[in-house]
Amino acid sequence: DDRRSPLEECFQQNDYEEFLEIARNSQLYQESLREDSSYHLSFIESLKSDALFSYEKKFWEADGIHGGKVINDLSLIHDLPKREIQALCYPSIKK
């Protein structure tokens, strides 16, 4: 199958900026802009299985530099510590 997902294309081309553009236009990201505090927990649960966040993790693990901007956005949106969101989504990240 030579039809790759747009996220896989970005990863293969090491194009983190394009990945961010896709991420920020995604339904998950747009839904995260809601201010309903009861939504936070189910939102964070959804991050664990969402393709966006698996690619965010892949970018991070590939070079230790890219990745984390989407998490940073979300920590600001939800007023949650970035470390808390990272720990929930990416247990392997130590920073």
From Swiss-Prot:
Swiss-Prot/TrEMBL keywords: Antibiotic, Antimicrobial, Apoptosis, Cytolysis, Disulfide bond, FAD, Flavoprotein, Glycoprotein, Hemolysis, Hemostasis impairing toxin, Oxidoreductase, Platelet aggregation inhibiting toxin, Secreted, Toxin
Segments traversing the membrane: none
EC identifiers of the protein: 1.4.3.2
Cofactor names: FAD
Compartment(s): Secreted
Domain of life per record: Eukaryota
Tissue-specific expression: Expressed by the venom gland.
PTM comment: N-glycosylated.
GO molecular function: L-phenylalaine oxidase activity; toxin activity
GO CC annotation: extracellular region
Primary subcellular site in the record, as a coarse category: secreted
Reactions it catalyzes: an L-alpha-amino acid + O2 + H2O = a 2-oxocarboxylate + H2O2 + NH4(+); L-leucine + O2 + H2O = 4-methyl-2-oxopentanoate + H2O2 + NH4(+); L-phenylalanine + O2 + H2O = 3-phenylpyruvate + H2O2 + NH4(+); L-tryptophan + O2 + H2O = indole-3-pyruvate + H2O2 + NH4(+)
Record GO biological process: apoptotic process; defense response to bacterium; killing of cells of another organism
Complexes and interactors: Homodimer; non-covalently linked.
Function statement: Catalyzes an oxidative deamination of predominantly hydrophobic and aromatic L-amino acids, thus producing hydrogen peroxide that may contribute to the diverse toxic effects of this enzyme. Is highly active on L-Met, L-Leu, L-Phe, L-Trp, and L-Arg, and no weakly or no active on L-His, L-Tyr, L-Ile, L-Gln, and L-Lys. Exhibits diverse biological activities, such as antibacterial activity against both Gram-positive (B.subtilis) and Gram-negative (E.coli) bacteria, and inhibition of ADP- or collagen-induced platelet aggregation.
Family per similarity comment: Belongs to the flavin monoamine oxidase family. FIG1 subfamily.
Protein name listed in UniProt: L-amino-acid oxidase
Native source organism of the sequence: Naja oxiana (Central Asian cobra)
